[in-house]
């Protein structure tokens, strides 16, 4: 599977205070929905990812329920966070 430039940029460095929209799979619409629910930074979404024990099915279902992410968006976001964790945790 090839990854987007957005994905590669995200996993290339520590997360810091990056906005939630910097995550692969999260565009303007999903970013706004997540922000409205308190997930304004990428690290807040990472926290949920970790609470769900990095489980792909649970995380993707949570993302769908929380902001309406489709299958590709949730898969891209999951892959981005998984790869970031592999590199930095």
Swiss-Prot record:
<dbReference type="GO" id="GO:0000785">
    <property type="term" value="C:chromatin"/>
</dbReference>
<comment type="similarity">
    <text>Belongs to the BAF family.</text>
</comment>
<dbReference type="GO" id="GO:0005635">
    <property type="term" value="C:nuclear envelope"/>
</dbReference>
<keyword id="KW-0963">Cytoplasm</keyword>
<dbReference type="GO" id="GO:0010836">
    <property type="term" value="P:negative regulation of protein ADP-ribosylation"/>
</dbReference>
<dbReference type="GO" id="GO:0160049">
    <property type="term" value="P:negative regulation of cGAS/STING signaling pathway"/>
</dbReference>
<dbReference type="GO" id="GO:0007084">
    <property type="term" value="P:mitotic nuclear membrane reassembly"/>
</dbReference>
<keyword id="KW-0597">Phosphoprotein</keyword>
<dbReference type="GO" id="GO:0075713">
    <property type="term" value="P:establishment of integrated proviral latency"/>
</dbReference>
<feature type="modified residue" description="Phosphoserine; by VRK1 and VRK2">
    <location>
        <position position="4"/>
    </location>
</feature>
<dbReference type="GO" id="GO:0003677">
    <property type="term" value="F:DNA binding"/>
</dbReference>
<feature type="modified residue" description="Phosphothreonine; by VRK1 and VRK2">
    <location>
        <position position="2"/>
    </location>
</feature>
<dbReference type="GO" id="GO:0032480">
    <property type="term" value="P:negative regulation of type I interferon production"/>
</dbReference>
<dbReference type="GO" id="GO:0003690">
    <property type="term" value="F:double-stranded DNA binding"/>
</dbReference>
<feature type="domain" description="HhH">
    <location>
        <begin position="20"/>
        <end position="35"/>
    </location>
</feature>
<keyword id="KW-0158">Chromosome</keyword>
<dbReference type="InterPro" id="IPR036617">
    <property type="entry name" value="BAF_sf"/>
</dbReference>
<dbReference type="GO" id="GO:0005829">
    <property type="term" value="C:cytosol"/>
</dbReference>
<feature type="modified residue" description="Phosphothreonine; by VRK1 and VRK2">
    <location>
        <position position="3"/>
    </location>
</feature>
<dbReference type="GO" id="GO:0015074">
    <property type="term" value="P:DNA integration"/>
</dbReference>
<dbReference type="GO" id="GO:0006979">
    <property type="term" value="P:response to oxidative stress"/>
</dbReference>
<dbReference type="InterPro" id="IPR051387">
    <property type="entry name" value="BAF"/>
</dbReference>
<dbReference type="Pfam" id="PF02961">
    <property type="entry name" value="SAM_BAF"/>
</dbReference>
<feature type="modified residue" description="N-acetylthreonine; in Barrier-to-autointegration factor, N-terminally processed">
    <location>
        <position position="2"/>
    </location>
</feature>
<dbReference type="GO" id="GO:0005654">
    <property type="term" value="C:nucleoplasm"/>
</dbReference>
<comment type="subunit">
    <text>Homodimer. Heterodimerizes with BANF2. Interacts with ANKLE2/LEM4, leading to decreased phosphorylation by VRK1 and promoting dephosphorylation by protein phosphatase 2A (PP2A). Binds non-specifically to double-stranded DNA, and is found as a hexamer or dodecamer upon DNA binding. Binds to LEM domain-containing nuclear proteins such as LEMD3/MAN1, TMPO/LAP2 and EMD (emerin). Interacts with ANKLE1 (via LEM domain); the interaction may favor BANF1 dimerization. Interacts with CRX and LMNA (lamin-A). Binds linker histone H1.1 and core histones H3. Interacts with LEMD2 (via LEM domain).</text>
</comment>
<dbReference type="GO" id="GO:0045071">
    <property type="term" value="P:negative regulation of viral genome replication"/>
</dbReference>
<keyword id="KW-0238">DNA-binding</keyword>
<keyword id="KW-0007">Acetylation</keyword>
<keyword id="KW-0539">Nucleus</keyword>
<feature type="modified residue" description="N-acetylmethionine">
    <location>
        <position position="1"/>
    </location>
</feature>
<dbReference type="GO" id="GO:0042803">
    <property type="term" value="F:protein homodimerization activity"/>
</dbReference>
<dbReference type="GO" id="GO:0006325">
    <property type="term" value="P:chromatin organization"/>
</dbReference>
<protein>
    <recommendedName>
        <fullName>Barrier-to-autointegration factor</fullName>
    </recommendedName>
</protein>
<dbReference type="GO" id="GO:0045824">
    <property type="term" value="P:negative regulation of innate immune response"/>
</dbReference>
<comment type="function">
    <text>Non-specific DNA-binding protein that plays key roles in mitotic nuclear reassembly, chromatin organization, DNA damage response, gene expression and intrinsic immunity against foreign DNA. Contains two non-specific double-stranded DNA (dsDNA)-binding sites which promote DNA cross-bridging. Plays a key role in nuclear membrane reformation at the end of mitosis by driving formation of a single nucleus in a spindle-independent manner.</text>
</comment>
<dbReference type="GO" id="GO:0000793">
    <property type="term" value="C:condensed chromosome"/>
</dbReference>
<dbReference type="InterPro" id="IPR004122">
    <property type="entry name" value="BAF_prot"/>
</dbReference>
